Amino acid sequence: MSYKIRSNDLVIVLTGKDKGKVGIVKKIYRSNNTVIVEGINIVKKHQKSIPEKQQSGGIISKELPIHISNVSIFNKKLKKSDKVEFFWHLGKKKRRFKSNKELIQ
């Protein structure tokens, strides 16, 4: 399946506690259709110290994945979410925004 969102894309969160926030996609998990977005869905985890591994304990902030359907690609020029369309250019498949036909880098 071809995803319209890829790593390093600028996305906006559509639903949930972080609705309206914009971030960059760090990683995509294709097996369960989730993405990790930088600075979004941050939780605090209480970590026990492990002396054998020289790992200190404490409270760690961690980014958890969110479902890919809850994010949309963000168009900087229009400052809103947008749809993606694929097209062929010089024998290569490219992506662009549907509203203003601008290429997605």
UniProtKB/Swiss-Prot annotation:
Keywords attached to this Swiss-Prot or TrEMBL record, sorted alphabetically, are:
Ribonucleoprotein, Ribosomal protein, RNA-binding, rRNA-binding
What SMART domains does the record point to? KOW
Q: Which Pfam families match?
A: KOW (PF00467), ribosomal_L24 (PF17136)
Q: Which SUPFAM superfamilies is this protein grouped with?
A: Translation proteins SH3-like domain
Question: Keyword Ribosomal protein: yes or no?
Answer: yes
Which InterPro entries would you find in this protein's record?
Answer: KOW, Rib_uL2_dom2, Ribosomal_uL24, Ribosomal_uL24_CS, Ribosomal_uL24_KOW, Translation_prot_SH3-like_sf
In which family does this protein belong, per the annotation? Belongs to the universal ribosomal protein uL24 family.
Function of the protein? One of two assembly initiator proteins, it binds directly to the 5'-end of the 23S rRNA, where it nucleates assembly of the 50S subunit. One of the proteins that surrounds the polypeptide exit tunnel on the outside of the subunit.
Q: How does it assemble?
A: Part of the 50S ribosomal subunit.
Name-wise, this protein is: Large ribosomal subunit protein uL24
What organism does the UniProt record list as the source? Buchnera aphidicola subsp. Cinara cedri (strain Cc)
